[in-house]
Amino acid sequence: MDSGNNLRIGLPSKGRLSDIAGDLLKQAGLSFRRQSRGLFARVSGLPVELIFLRTDDIPTLCAEGAIDMGITGSDLLEESGGSAEVRMRLGVGRCRLAICVPDDANLNSAADLDGKRIATSFPAITKRYLAKHQASAHLVALSGSVEVMIQLGVADAIVDLVETGSTLAANRLRILEEIDSYETVLIQNDRCRDTETADRVVRRLEGVVIARDYSLLEYNVPRSKLEAAEAITPGFNSPTVNTLEDPEWCSVRVMVKRGAVIDAMERLETVGASAVIETPISNCRL
């Protein structure tokens, strides 16, 4: 197929999000080989071309039609104000965007920032948020190292992404207000050159993302207790049940939410189940 007709997917060229995106694609069977610092790569077995870009450029390039899809942060998508839409949430790279001020600052809400200086890499989001709180500030737009701007005398407050809060503590800062929560997303524009392949990509990625939330639970149970066991682990349509050599017993295989596995195992024991085994799932179709 002519490479000009290939589905183009933009991926972060470096950093933690680059590793996350690359691993996710490979887990979904979208294997590729990128040359050192290469900007392009082909996906094996599919008419898909990967283009490695600056993460914050991906929303704009997708909206403009230079790429059909892209993996980026929902924070960057919102900041760009472009027309690309979220095709699916990938469940990784979660973080919070927050207004942060010095520990000893006499500031108690966003409204108190009226007339103050705020350093941020997200001026558009910050401006909209302040407007909702009847505040207007002088925004200092930066591309990084925002957390030191207060100490340098550049700003009275910052708006930055927060994960654990350890960086804030190290710089004697506290969260004044959280603006929103964000995560890594797959985006797509409305002029996608190959919607059929785009749908296949989405379906493959969904298989990986959904599988993260489930485990396969297998156990043996007396046939007389099968109904009680099925009530504990109902599965999606119904559990897979097989008869064992002893007709009084059967084996059951069922998908269970990972967060509910331990509780389910304990409850299964109370109804007589044995040989209860949890197996992680790397991919699935539901």
Which positions does each model-derived feature cover?
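Small-molecule-sensing regulatory modules
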Residues: 2-48, 72-85, 89-92, 96, ...
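Short, structured active-site "lid" loops
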Residues: 47-66
